[in-house]
Amino acid sequence: MPQNDHGRLSLGRATPSDLPFIMETERLPGFDKMVGRWTADQHKAAYSNPSYAYLIGTEIGGEAFGFAIIRDLDDPHGNVCLKRIAIASPGRGYGTPFLGMVLDWVFREATAYRVWLDVLADNDRARHVYMRGGFIEEGLLRRAYKLPDESRIDLILMSILRPEWLKQRLTRSTE
């Protein structure tokens, strides 16, 4: 399993036994708005779909702390979507290293050229983490997301390209 620079976190492919943790994390207060949530059947369908990858972040000792769902692994143009990423207990400093580990996996294992995502326009914390991770804001999807209360909110489209990721990796390795 790849480890981050601090050696205390690792990343691997999720197994079916990780789905309860993923669903519990999606159901934490406020996460339905920021992260979204799926039913068990939706997760099982995506998990068994070869165009998806479920990744799980663990601390030393094996305790899960976060997950990521990647989709479009079969995109012929190398455009892979970071569909969902979440940390079960935010504020512990795991977000940025976890995102870096996920990007390393996507660019190495999935051989993506571009990783894209959309984020709620008012989710400043996530946007900050994505920008620190090398993502660039590409545009605004106006009122594109319906919230649980049926109101609508803008999404910000963001991406990072393989050359940007490589440059960032080189910069990190020389620091």
Map each language-model feature to its residues.
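Short acidic N-proximal helix/loop "leader" segments that mark the beginning
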Residues: 1-5
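Short hydrophobic/aromatic beta-strand or adjacent loop that forms the aromatic wall/cage
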Residues: 52, 153-157
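Conserved catalytic-core motifs of GNAT/GCN5-like acyltransferases
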Residues: 116-118, 136-153
